Amino acid sequence: MAKLNTKLRGCSQESSVSSLLASGSLSGSRSDSAHSAHSSFVYKDQLYSSASEALQAYIDDFDLSREHPGANAVKVNTDGEIGNGLQFSSYVHIPDNAFVNLDPKQHFNPLYYRRETVNDMDAISLTTDDLLRLPADGCFSFPCVPPDHRPNKKYSGRQDSSDIKNSPSFYVDATSKSKNNIVPPYVYTNINGKKCGRPRTPKPINRENKCVSESSLSFPKESSFTEDSAERRLENYPRWLTSQKSDLSVSGVTSIPDVKYPIWLHNQDLLPEANTPRGYKLLNEDEYRPIHSYQTQRANQLLNKIDCFEYTFKPSNLTDSFSEYEGLGNEFKCQCDNPLLPGQSQKPFCGDKIELLILKAKKNLKQSAKDLPKPVEKDDSPCSLDKLEAERTWENVPVAFKSPVPVKADDSPQQSSRTQCVNAFLEDFLNGENQSSTLSGGKHHGPVEALKQMLFNLQTVQESFNKNKTTEPEEEIKQVSEDDLAKLQMKENMMPITRSLHKALQHLSRLRDLVDDTSGRQSPKK
């Protein structure tokens, strides 16, 4: 049977993992089934059936040594007993008599215990399990964890009931339902928060009887202060966590007390008081409900004690020595009123509280109406509807209509476009002759007008040739007579024919002559 007797320290990073795996491979490679069935591994005096379990234990120990460098090595025996070890890396152990000689007023300050238990909060590296073990108010648990107790992952949840009862690391955590005349029984829980053991028999307290013994009035005693401070500490939930639980959208959180009313009801003194008969009746009705939050049960228990203290302070024949106790009682009551901020199971709207609520609502409405700005008169700032319904001058643009032009209907037949253009050209030409052309003035036609004039001149010349062709025979047309030249000279006086036109006409006449000569010479040869 292969055994690996290695003692690993908490902070040692030079552990022989290879030797551990080698021993496991040797034991697992044996062909004999009897030897392989009985093979086991020993790591820190703990037997493991396989090498994987031993390796996992080594990994867990190594991770723990890195998270808590100051922690000692944990030695787990085969019988499940837990050896020496610290719960936290920077946790300071406090003896049982550490809270004997303390100022009573310091018990209400959770920061006092925080300074006592841990010197430097930033130096602590807590895991998720450690954070879950802390109470709701953020300070460490009142009965500290002894140094010889640290649960192992392998044997967590396997402790016997005898070990749980004998373990000194248990404290009072929660209570069950209780009536007005019975103190809620205590339930023993371990450090993991699991309930175990049997509850203590309830101790009867008569609420109606106002006589209190001297033992109950021994206010400065250490036991009463430690008990009250422990109860006060367990009830100190933050307001952001208890005021609006429905808004958190957290389904798995069950330790947060259910809150039905906001905090402003308590600030406005709208919650029912337990001293009034109606409030006492409501408390009785609420406590018989099947589901009751932990905070309500603690508050009812504290109210029973407060009523006893208040009755003892009321007689006027008491000496001045009780004035300090009365001040402490009032302070204790004020602090005990804090858990009742939401008013978990109490009905706030009862009796005269409804009238007070209505009056305060009316007052708030009046104040809000006064704070509103006054409506502005129409003269200063017109309403938007008036602006929208008004006429839009930019849309009604005046349209300028032109006067109708009369159409001249003449009975005479219309002339052709050519004759009209020629007449207009002649009129312009005659008007232009009357005007003296000077270097500085005078009408000068543009290029477009000049082209038009040239076109008109060519058209007139073409018309004249066409007329001559129709009236005279071809032979007479070929020979230019003197009469035609005289007519052309007359037309030159009437129309401004340019030199180019003259040259063009001359070239045309010569070309015709040449054509006629060539045609006449070729005809007799044929």
From Swiss-Prot:
Might play a role in cell proliferation. It comes from Mus musculus. Widely expressed with highest levels in lung and spleen. Also expressed during embryonic development, at least from 7 to 17 dpc. InterPro entries: Cell_Prolif_Regulator (IPR052679), LAS2 (IPR031587). It comes from the Eukaryota. Pfam families: LAS2. The keyword Secreted applies. GO terms for biological process: negative regulation of cell population proliferation. This is Lung adenoma susceptibility protein 2. The modification Phosphoserine is found at residue 161. Its main location: secreted. GO terms for cellular component: extracellular region. Residues 1-31 form the signal peptide. Residues 150-170 are annotated as: Disordered. Keywords: Phosphoprotein, Secreted, Signal. The gene is Las2.
